[in-house]
UniProtKB/Swiss-Prot annotation:
Its main location: nucleus. Residues 103-112, 149-159, 179-200 have a biased composition (Basic and acidic residues). This is Craniofacial development protein 1. Gene duplication of the ancestral BCNT gene leads to the h-type BCNT (CFDP1) gene and the p97BCNT (CFDP2) gene. The latter contains a region derived from the endonuclease domain of a retrotransposable element RTE-1. This repetitive sequence associated with the BCNT gene is specific to Ruminantia. It is found in: Chromosome, Centromere, Kinetochore. The modification Phosphoserine is found at residues 82, 85, 116, 215. Residues 1-159, 179-223 are annotated as: Disordered. Residues 49-65 have a biased composition (Basic residues). Disulfide bonds: none annotated. The modification N6-methyllysine is found at residue 218. Residues 124-134 have a biased composition (Low complexity). It comes from Tragulus javanicus (Lesser Malay chevrotain). There is a cross-link at residue 149 (Glycyl lysine isopeptide (Lys-Gly) (interchain with G-Cter in SUMO2)).
């Protein structure tokens, strides 16, 4: 037994290189071998194709009919370069032409707009030839003359007022009062009517004087004269009116009418205080009235 075992162990190394004959292969072994062969073939084809592509990339020259075509390639490259430069020059020329055309069109538009603006503004800004240019002195003279004319026109408006003289009887004395009023006022109209009535009547014609002395015409004229005297009786003036008249005359003589008016319009003036007290009384009356009305309501 020991010898058999030693022989088996000695022959184990030789079994590694042992290849059985074709009849001893199984179907599985054959399929595996076929697959391995196909994989090896595919790998070889891939390697061959890769080497061909690399060779095509690194080939510096082309062969045409067994000869080198370096000169033809140089000519083609030069033609391409010249064609590229020519196309670039054409592009730049076309761009320049388009730029000049756009500038010309822009200038034309600006000129048209300026011309239309001048047409719109031109006739208004023109100075009429008939009117000469005035200097500063002439303008001052014209302005001063215009002011004088305006003052002259305003003067008659101010002097349109009419002076009225009224005669009053105060304690047997005759008092004359002069006023300046508008001609359209009631006092002026009444004064004009009264003055017309007081005018002397014209002489009676000769035909009337030839009548007998005992006629009724003389009686009528005598009665009218008596009625006129009665109508022309002087109006009486009260003491209050006389004092007021004297105060107005004093203010005019002293020239203090404006100062008194300004003082009276102030807070310390008598008129302003009186108006304030009147407003207070009126307000107090309104408050009392509201209270009475509120109490009367149910």
């Amino acid at each position: 037994m020991e010898e058999f075992d030693s022989e088996d162990f000695s022959t184990s190394e030789e079994d590694e290189d042992y290849v059985p004959s074709g009849g001893e292969y199984s179907e599985d072994d054959i399929n595996e071998l076929v697959k391995e062969d196909e994989v090896d073939v595919e790998e070889e084809t891939h390697i061959i194709k890769g080497t061909k592509r690399k060779a095509e990339r690194f080939m510096p020259r082309k062969r045409k009919q067994g000869g080198l075509s370096l000169e033809e390639e140089d000519e083609e490259d030069a033609g391409r370069e010249s064609g590229g430069s020519g196309s670039e020059e054409e592009d730049t020329a076309t761009e320049q032409e388009e730029g000049t055309e756009s500038e010309d069109a822009r200038k034309k538009k600006e000129d048209e707009l300026w011309a239309s603006f001048l047409n719109d503004v031109g006739p208004k800004s023109k100075v009429p030839p008939s009117t000469p240019v005035k200097t500063g002195e002439e303008t001052e003279e014209t302005s001063s003359s215009n002011l004088v004319k305006a003052e002259e026109q305003e003067k008659p408006k101010e002097t349109e007022k009419v002076k009225i003289t009224k005669v009053f009887d105060f304690a047997g004395e005759e008092v004359r009062v002069t006023k300046e009023v508008d001609p359209t006022s009631k006092e002026a109209k009444s004064f004009f009517k009264q003055s017309e009535k007081e005018k002397p009547q014209p002489n009676v014609p000769s035909a009337v004087s030839s009548l007998p002395a005992g006629s009724g015409l003389k009686r009528s004229s005598g009665m009218s004269s008596l009625l006129g005297k009665i109508g022309a009786k002087k109006q009486k003036m009260s003491t209050l009116e006389k004092s007021k008249l004297d105060w107005e005359n004093f203010k005019e003589e002293e020239g203090i009418a404006e100062e008194l008016a300004i003082h009276n319009r102030g807070k310390e003036g008598y008129i302003e205080r009186k108006a304030f007290l009147d407003r207070v009384d009126h307000r107090q009356f309104e408050i009392e009235r509201d209270l009475r009305l509120s109490k009367m309501k149910p």
